[in-house]
UniProtKB/Swiss-Prot annotation:
One of its GO terms (biological process) is translation. GO terms for cellular component: cytoplasm; small ribosomal subunit. Coiled coil: none annotated. It comes from Synechococcus sp. (strain JA-3-3Ab) (Cyanobacteria bacterium Yellowstone A-Prime). One of its GO terms (molecular function) is structural constituent of ribosome. This is Small ribosomal subunit protein bS16. It comes from the Bacteria. Residues 124-143 have a biased composition (Low complexity). Gene3D superfamilies: 3.30.1320.10. InterPro entries: Ribosomal_bS16, Ribosomal_bS16_CS, Ribosomal_bS16_dom_sf. Residues 100-155 are annotated as: Disordered. Pfam families: Ribosomal_S16.
Length: 155
């Protein structure tokens, strides 16, 4: 099962978090399937990639309690109910500190959610179509050169 959760970054006592889609059995710092935004609890600044979040929620990803509260504040669930598809590329929730430069809008995804869910299942290591072992990797045709024997000097 895929979870939407926080991945910790930052220095000691100065945490920042990235909101990621990750396999539920993976460790907190594990490799995510996709990064979907970030959250800074010190300044309360949050940036969410709505298209990616909506895609994962449609696929059945389960948000943790903290991510769920961030999604509610941003209005992601209303977008999901209304059926909006990634009309807004990113949402920036105002912070207490100075806002950073805007994030460039990514190109809208043309993939169907079902196809994306299947592709993410393959990436997560779930059963699916698997290539034969011979087709996945070809053997290296270069052979290492043998080392030359050095003459031994008797002392």
């Amino acid at each position: 099962m895929v979870k939407l959760r926080l991945k910790r970054y930052g220095k000691r006592r100065q945490p920042t978090y990235r909101i990621v889609a990750i396999e539920s059995k993976a460790r907190r710092e594990g490799r995510p399937l996709e990064e979907l935004g970030y959250y800074n609890p010190r300044t309360k600044e949050t940036v969410l990639e709505t298209a990616g979040l909506l895609k994962w929620l449609r696929c059945g990803a389960q948000p943790t309690d903290t991510v769920d509260s961030l999604l509610r504040k941003a209005g992601i669930y209303e977008m999901l109910k209304a059926g909006e598809g990634g009309v807004v590329a990113a949402i920036r929730i105002p912070a207490i500190a100075k806002p950073e430069a805007g994030i460039p809008d990514p190109a809208p995804s043309t993939e169907e959610p079902a196809a994306v869910c299947e592709a993410s299942a393959e990436m997560a290591g779930q059963p699916g179509e698997v290539e034969p072992a011979g087709a996945a990797a070809e053997p290296n045709s270069q052979e290492p050169e043998p080392e030359e024997e050095k003459p031994q000097v008797e002392a």
